Amino acid sequence: SLPDPTVSRAVMRLPDEQRTAVILYYVQGMKIREIAKALKVPTQTISSRLSRARSKLRAELEGWYFDEE
């Protein structure tokens, strides 16, 4: 599962293809080539989806941080 409700909501707002790649890569721990094979797309497609997803999440979560207390 995702570490925080704020992050979870941001991930759920991603486009379907990006959200799927993020969940499979970061939550399920799959490798890019495994995701590509499972989804029947080139590995570069998965890399691109993850890159776009990270950019969107970075912009949406700007200023958000983990409370270290």
Which residues are covered by each model-predicted region?
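Short helix-coil-helix linker/hinge
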Residues: 11-19
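Acidic, proline/glycine-rich intrinsically disordered inter-domain spacer in sigma factors
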Residues: 1-12
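A short pre-motif secondary-structure segment
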Residues: 21-25
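Intrinsically disordered, low-complexity basic tails/linkers immediately adjacent to helix-turn-helix/homeobox/MYB/SANT
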Residues: 67-69
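Short, conserved catalytic or interaction motifs in soluble domains
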Residues: 16, 27, 52
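Flexible coil/turn residues that form the inter-helical turn or adjacent wing/linker of helix-turn-helix
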Residues: 28-29, 34
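DNA-recognition helix of helix-turn-helix
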Residues: 33, 39-63
